[in-house]
Structures are given as C-alpha cells and as structure tokens.
Amino acid sequence: PLPYSSFYISDPKPRHIHKANIRDRVLHQAIFRVLYPIFDKTFIHDSYSSLVDKGTHAGVARLLDFLRKASANYQKPAFALKCDVSRFFDLIDHRILLELIARRIHDEHCLTLVRQIVESFSTAPGKGLPLGNVTSQLFANIYLNELDQFVKHSLKRHWCLRYCDDFVMVGSDREELHALIEPIRQFLDERFVRTL
C-alpha cells in the first residue's frame, strides 16, 4: 500500500480522515466485497453502522421502537444508557483484528491482503485503523461483534443497538441499566484492553 493523504472534517467534532490512493481503494473495495457477505451474517440484527439496509435512520427507528416497548407504549418511564468505546479507531489492536478475521477466512492470499491493509496504517505500534477506508468500517463491525454478542447473549440485553463505537441499551429500570456498565467495561478490558 502507498501512503495515505489526510484531511480534517467536522462531524460535528473534528475527525482526522486518511484517504488511500485510488489503486489501494480498488483493492479495499474488492476485499470488502469478499469479506462482507461472510461476516454480515454473523452480526447481530441491531448493528447499524455501514451495513446494507441499515444506517442512522434505521438505527433511530429501532431505538424509538425499543423506547416504546420499554415504556409500555409511553405509559411508564423508560431509560437509555448510551456508551462510547474510548478512542476506538485509534486503539484497535491489529493482532486481535487479524485473529478475528482469520477465524472465518482461511484463504492465505486473502489474509495476506487483509494484513497489508490493516498494517498500512497505525496510530501506535500495532494499533489503529484509518477513518476513511471502506474496509475500516467493516473491520470495526468485526471487532465489536464480540461485544454485541456479549451484551445480547451473556447480559441478555435485547433492547440494545450499536452504531460503530457507540451503543445504546434501553430499559425500564435505571439502576439495572447503570449496573451494566461494569461488566461491559470488564469485558472490553479483558478482551480488547479497552474501556468505555
């Protein structure tokens, strides 16, 4: 891969975008088209970032549905716990990401190309993905799919959705939602050496 060009946008906070050259973007698109159908079927239904037929509007509609259910059709209070994985793209661990991908992809040529894409950018040794690559969005979903599975299946939170590194859990009990912070923080720390 060739070096990235970079620029800043405000979305609403400043974000540093790294743009691959055209040749590398064609490769990223090809890798995305190979990996997406394999991993898409592993994601929870309520993951909304950069997925076909999902996105912000679908995520907001689903959140409103969760709030309606938690409030018994707006007859009682409902609460939402919004969490954000701290410095998510900057601190994605390359080794962990590549291990997660290798669980489903066994073709060595494909894995070599994926490794080259992942390792073409870093914010610290072995860490970070660039904002701006089509593959980065898919890699983010692959990386956080384990968190999604933990929240949905281990913590039994059915009214939960995620958009990239932000996720929201809805319920009718504020204290019950607040009590979820520590097990999620512990999961992130143990699995990814990360925090909320």
Model-derived regions, located:
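A short glycine/small-residue-enriched secondary-structure motif
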Residues: 2-13, 40
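Charged boundary/loop elements
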Residues: 37, 41-46
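Basic, flexible linker segments flanking DNA-binding modules
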Residues: 50-52
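Duplex nucleic acid-engaging cores and interfaces of nucleic-acid transaction enzymes
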Residues: 56, 60, 64
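Active-site flanking loop/helix segments enriched in acidic
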Residues: 8-17, 125-131
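Structural motif
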Residues: 18-26, 105
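Conserved polymerase palm-domain catalytic core
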Residues: 3, 46, 66-196
